């Protein structure tokens, strides 16, 4: 039996990734009984999703990376999309390189991911060139997310903004409601649907059902982060009831 330490750098008011990522990885135990995972987090202060707090939070990510590397993680992920996307197109590359170097300077060689980078990498790996998205954000921030994705050469056909500004309230949204929201989303002709383009908006209970409902791959921030974590750990990318990309299928791109 081998134990993998999963590290997350999270906004202080977030709880969802620390719920959904353990749920997915522990759901693997029946199929992969030789695996065990432990879960560890370091927090960046953030209560409201605004430019000032996002910038301060991004700076704090360096401290968090050092703290997690002290405990010798197997892999770590910067689990916030908008903190990175708000800094400008392609910023996940800058952030990941900086955090990777910070960890290396602490004497640790481990993969350092970000949820923003994992989104871009996963869409490209699977050849998804057109998507539609659901976010909890106010419309200007949803546009920033869509623009970031489009700057990577992936078209965002449609988006729904739930317009919940309080980050704690986002974490309390009912994932079952996403099954109704997705009916309002224009997903004709898209390659995939992003059911939750936010690490704090719960979606895991709805992922597989939404995919079955619309007949297209359905992803979320937690799902694509787990996919990239498993890849970087050299493990099979399979999680039950977590959608197409975690079904063990190999990318076509």
From Swiss-Prot:
Keyword Transcription regulation: no
EC category name: isomerase
Active site, per annotation: 80 (nucleophile), 198 (proton donor)
Catalytic activity: maleate = fumarate
Keywords for the protein's UniProt record, in alphabetical order: Isomerase
S-(2-succinyl)cysteine carried by residues: 80
GO biological process: protein homotetramerization
Binding site for substrate: 14, 80-82, 137, 167, 199-200
Record bears the keyword Transcription regulation: no
Note: Reaction is initiated by nucleophilic attack of cysteine at the double bond, yielding a covalent succinylcysteine-like intermediate.
Protein name: Maleate isomerase
The organism of origin for this protein: Alcaligenes faecalis
The organism's taxonomic lineage, starting at the top: Bacteria, Pseudomonadati, Pseudomonadota, Betaproteobacteria, Burkholderiales
